[in-house]
Design a protein with these regions (language model features):
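Assembly/oligomerization interface modules of large self-assembling protein complexes
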Residues: 2-83, 107, 290
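Short helix/loop capping segments that flank catalytic or ligand/cofactor-binding pockets
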Residues: 54-56, 85-86, 94-95, 188-191, ...
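A short, structural micro-pattern
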Residues: 39, 78, 173, 211, ...
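Alpha-helical scaffold segments that mediate packing/assembly in large oligomeric complexes
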Residues: 87-171, 293-294, 299-301
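Extended oligomerization regions of viral-like shell subunits
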Residues: 149-266
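Structured loops at beta-to-helix junctions and adjacent beta-edge loops in soluble globular domains
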Residues: 48-49, 87, 182-184, 220, ...
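Short loop/turn segments at secondary-structure transitions that flank enzyme active sites
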Residues: 51, 81, 90, 115, ...
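Protruding loop/beta-arch "assembly-hinge" segments enriched in small, turn-prone residues
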Residues: 1-27, 253, 261-301
Length: 301
């Protein structure tokens, strides 16, 4: 087992599927939008819209041009990785013990990828550094959703904020099917009262309902991560695509300094090996007009 892994290998089929399942369960983006397999070399999603309405043509009348607009969004997977040092006893562990370690690693890696998907797609940041990623560029909701599609957040009327976001989306010809809110906004909704009673009791005591009206609902700290002013992302998530390329390599590195850590130094010198996992995932916003953001006002302080 150890000698095979030391040369690098792929996750066994059931572990790879487990990663997919856990990402769907812990990423709000994944919850609101099912994944589409993305080829390793990327995929081009074509968008097509008819610019006008059908036209009545009188007998012997002339037909006019309704017009159509065609575009394309290219989705190219990018690579994310996670690595950590572990005791080299992993290399001599029994198969059962090694599988147990791999399953624990699988769960942890899945959680990191899930959170990373949200942070990258919503904010366009490198999850590890928290800084804007030049690799992602403007392929994120914070960059794409602007102008009248940004609703100013009010802690006293968070439900109205969502209604206002829905109005913007509907005016663009879409029907919102999903919403994810920051925990602060979920708490504000829970605190609303009418005639001395909770207005939305399904939010009481930290509850996160599966649906809000006809929309899939979730609450996640990734929305307001770091210093972000985002409080909610609302939209028609059929206008968003994301997915994995299939390979999920797990490499066990037995020597060297693969994490470039000058303090920890060589692996063999410290009886360690290095576990590194990589995933290839991509996403694309097919039409920014299908989405709206609720944002807190910028503080003057």
């Amino acid at each position: 087992m150890g000698s095979i892994l030391s040369k690098g290998s792929l996750f066994p089929e059931h572990l790879a599927q487990e990663i997919f399942n856990q990402v769907r369960g812990k990423s709000s983006i994944a919850k609101l939008c099912g994944q589409t397999p993305i080829p390793f070399n990327g995929i081009k999603e074509f968008t097509f819209s008819m610019d006008s309405e059908v036209d009545i043509v009188a007998e012997n009348g002339a037909k006019s041009n309704g017009g159509a607009t065609m575009g394309a969004v290219t989705i190219v997977p990018l690579k994310v990785e996670y690595g950590a040092r572990v005791s080299d006893e992993f290399m001599t562990a029994s198969e059962e013990e090694a599988i147990s370690i791999l399953q624990a690693w699988t769960e942890g890696f899945a959680r990191k990828v899930a959170k990373g998907l949200d942070l990258m797609a919503i904010h366009g940041i490198n999850p590890r550094t928290g800084s804007a990623s030049t690799v992602i560029g403007t392929n994120n909701f914070d960059s794409k959703v602007t102008g009248s599609a940004i609703i100013t957040y009010s802690a006293s009327t968070p439900d109205t904020n969502i209604d206002d976001a829905l109005a913007v989306i509907e005016a663009a010809g879409y029907e919102a099917n999903g919403v994810v809110v920051a925990p602060t906004m979920r708490s504000a909704i829970a605190a609303l009262t009418a005639n001395g009673a909770r207005k939305y009791p399904e939010f009481a005591w930290g509850a996160v309902p599966a649906n809000l009206g006809s929309m899939v609902f979730d609450s996640n700290g990734t929305v307001s991560h770091g210093s972000s002013l985002d409080r909610a992302l609302v939209g028609d998530f059929t206008a968003f695509k994301w997915g994995f390329s299939k390979e999920l390599p797990l490499e066990v590195i037995p020597y060297g300094n693969p994490d470039n850590d000058a303090t920890l130094g060589d692996l063999k010198g410290h009886n360690q090996v290095y576990l590194r996992s990589e995933a290839y995932l991509g996403w694309g916003i097919l039409d920014k007009n299908a989405f709206a953001l609720v944002k807190a006002a910028q503080s003057n302080g």
